[in-house]
């Protein structure tokens, strides 16, 4: 694909997305909720895979939300630069989901659920983004977090077949062995069946966001008699809430 073709394609996608975010005067989306895998579920499955010395592979879905099929009629104005001169007042009827739709995430989740079940996976009743497939002694776990996929199993040919199936259904990127997921760095020592999870990169990102990257590490509980200045305190309640919000979901 040439650079000019790529720029043209990106321009089309941007215009459609911008139109979609302003698509309706009357909002009627039906259900828009879409589940994602819980972080504790990911940690538990990684621990199980490490204990049994399973493979832990990672894949990424490209243009995720463009895969969903719409169950309702959605219309939008023609995007700027691509208006039909003979019918400038006509609107477009979407055939599939696009970025910007309220229901895009849910439609993608439903689409993925249907496709992966066709390949013999069963969905967990308690964790809707965790799937399992078994065949005798062969077991494969699949974890979905929006567009991130973790594959864990004890049979490489079976795992390869899952990759092939996903590649037929969606545009995929093979990430190989899982080393980084949801801001968590994975350190694996297979010979000892040990694994380490580190969020140092995420911590550095949060510190940089609040201009604290040069801060020195401290210890809790704080030293007796430590005096704090107002300059060290969040400048507003809003900033305090933001700082807390980055920490609480990760505990």
Segments from the language model and where they lie:
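Long, low-complexity, charge-biased intrinsically disordered regions
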Residues: 1-251
């Amino acid at each position: 694909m040439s650079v000019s073709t790529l720029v043209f394609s990106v321009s089309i996608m941007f215009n459609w997305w911008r139109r979609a975010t302003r698509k309706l005067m009357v909002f009627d989306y039906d259900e828009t909720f879409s589940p994602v895998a819980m972080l504790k579920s990911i940690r538990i499955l990684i621990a199980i895979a490490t204990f049994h010395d399973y493979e832990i592979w990672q894949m990424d879905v490209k243009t995720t939300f463009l895969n969903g099929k719409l169950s309702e009629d959605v219309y939008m104005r023609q995007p700027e630069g691509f208006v039909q001169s003979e019918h400038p007042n006509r609107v477009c009827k979407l055939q599939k989901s696009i970025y910007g739709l309220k229901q895009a995430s849910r439609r993608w989740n439903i689409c993925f659920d249907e496709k992966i079940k066709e390949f013999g996976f069963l969905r967990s009743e308690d964790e809707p983004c965790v799937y399992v497939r078994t065949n005798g002694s062969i077991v494969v776990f699949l974890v979905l977090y929006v567009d991130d996929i973790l594959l864990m199993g004890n049979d490489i040919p079976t795992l390869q077949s899952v990759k092939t199936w996903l590649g037929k259904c969606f545009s995929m990127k093979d990430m190989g062995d899982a080393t980084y997921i949801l801001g968590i760095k994975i350190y694996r020592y297979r010979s000892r069946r040990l694994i380490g999870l580190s969020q140092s990169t995420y911590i550095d990102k949060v510190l940089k966001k609040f201009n604290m990257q040069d801060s020195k590490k401290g210890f809790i509980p704080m030293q007796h008699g430590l005096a704090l200045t107002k300059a060290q305190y969040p400048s507003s309640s809003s900033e305090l809430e933001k700082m807390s919000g980055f920490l609480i979901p990760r505990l």
